[in-house]
Design a protein with these regions (language model features):
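FAD-site-proximal beta/loop scaffold in flavoenzymes
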Residues: 123-142, 232-302, 306
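Glycine-rich Rossmann-fold phosphate-binding loop(s) that bind the pyrophosphate
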Residues: 17-20, 148-150, 290
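FAD-binding core/adjacent interface of flavoenzyme oxidoreductases
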Residues: 2-11, 73-145, 239-241
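Eukaryotic N-terminal low-complexity, Ser/Thr- and Lys/Arg-rich leader segments
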Residues: 1-12, 218-224, 364-373
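A Rossmann-like FAD-binding core segment of flavoenzymes
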Residues: 76-84, 90, 99, 165-269, ...
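Glycine-rich active-site loop/strand segments that organize a redox cofactor
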Residues: 41-47, 51-56, 107-137, 338-339, ...
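C-terminal, flexible cofactor-proximal segment of oxidoreductases
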Residues: 10, 291, 300-373
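Beta1-alpha1 glycine-rich phosphate/pyrophosphate-binding loop at the start
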Residues: 2-77, 113, 155-185, 348
């Protein structure tokens, strides 16, 4: 294959995490003929940019899971990495299996509440069924409360009202502004207006005080949701879109001194973890001052993989520089807001560029597979 480089037989890159950053790094190394092993808890890549649509649209979830084996063959291993031994340069899986590395790319991502995240060791067929079952819970509910009005909560509320215009959807959020805090004020206001136009009821400046007592993601008629404003909201279904945290379990015991307070890994401009020239952090687990986005993870992966190749071929390392915020928020298939490089985008561009397809086609193309009908 064109672009392959001459590699020492001792070189073996291990990629921990098969999200957007992980598959981008794997494809880059594969193209250049660099031996690697991609490890993930699921047996398929989850295009979780489309997870919320898979939560409301029956039959859609199968388009959001792309099997790793068909793309990477024996270069993929399913399992959970529980430990990294930097002395022996091995990663240890939960089944006791050890995999040696010469270079390590950590793409562990974040975990959070279903349906926005799917974080359990699973088969993709089982994961697809979980989303199909969740669609039925939404279908059964008359009133849905979405807790958390960040980007995920905004998208969730909009997807429900787009697919089910007869359902009452209430979004509860502690801030007066919705969506990501890093967005331009005008974009956040636009997101708020789209929600209102879609008929979402907004309870802003409020926190849910009894979340721990509520059964999430299951339709239960007459659930009472309490806020810190002494309000009670009655709903049939509660969906939590808050509390994502960095997946640091794989490296916490070994790389504690390299971790920021959030659990992310401190990196230099080459995305090398502090104190290591052969360990890289990519995506959400890299402590960079920018939003945690699939788009950024892909950029990180290209830098990390390129730097591994450059280090093997005696070339200078490339640097990663954060830029102005680029973020597109899909608010159902017919609406979207966002900005590019710090500039607000027209809604029709976001709708056409992201909301209609959620870029599912792009992941299938990058994985070299054909999407199911």
């Amino acid at each position: 294959m064109g672009g392959q480089v001459s590699i020492d037989e001792n070189v073996h890159v291990v990629i921990v995490g098969g999200g957007f950053g992980g598959i981008a790094a794997a494809q880059h190394l594969k193209h250049h003929g660099v031996p690697f092993m991609l490890i993930d808890i699921l047996d398929a890549f989850h295009h979780n940019v489309a997870a919320l649509r898979a939560s409301v649209k029956a039959g859609f979830a199968k388009q959001t899971f792309i099997p790793y084996k068909e793309t990477f063959g024996l270069n993929f291993l399913q399992g959970r990495v529980t430990q990294i031994d930097s002395e022996t340069q091995t990663v240890v899986l939960d089944n006791g299996k050890q995999v040696r590395y010469s270079h390590l790319i950590l793409c562990t991502g974040t975990s959070g509440h279903f349906p926005g995240k799917h974080n359990s060791v699973d088969t993709y067929q089982s994961a697809i069924q979980k989303y199909e079952d969740f669609v039925k819970e939404i279908q059964e509910a008359n009133t849905v409360v979405v807790v958390g009005g960040g980007t995920t909560g905004v998208e969730m509320a909009a997807e429900i009202r787009t697919e089910f215009t007869d359902k009452k959807v209430i979004l509860i959020h502690p801030r007066e502004e919705v969506a990501d805090p890093d967005l331009l004020p005008s974009v956040k206001e636009q997101a708020k207006q789209v929600l209102l136009e879609k008929g979402v009821e907004l309870l802003l400046g409020r926190k849910v005080t009894n979340l721990d007592e509520l059964e999430l993601n299951v339709c239960r008629k007459g659930m009472e949701i309490k806020t810190n404003k002494n309000e009670q909201v009655t709903a049939d279904l509660v969906i939590c879109c808050t509390g994502n945290k960095i997946n640091s379990d794989a490296y916490r015991s070994t790389l504690t001194t390299c971790m920021a307070e959030s659990g992310a890994l401190k990196v230099n401009q080459h995305l090398q973890v502090e104190g290591f020239d052969n360990v890289y952090a990519v995506g959400d687990c890299a402590n960079l001052n920018e939003p945690k986005l699939a788009y950024h993870a892909g950029l990180h992966a290209a830098v990390a993989a390129t730097n591994i190749i450059n280090s093997l071929t005696g070339k200078c390392l490339t640097s990663y520089r954060t830029g102005n915020v680029t973020m597109l928020i899909a608010m159902g298939k017919d609406a979207g807001v966002g900005q590019f490089n710090g500039y607000k985008l027209p809604q029709f561009l976001v709708t056409k560029g992201k909301s209609q397809s959620l870029l599912v086609w792009k992941s299938w193309r990058e994985m070299g597979q054909k999407a199911p009908n």
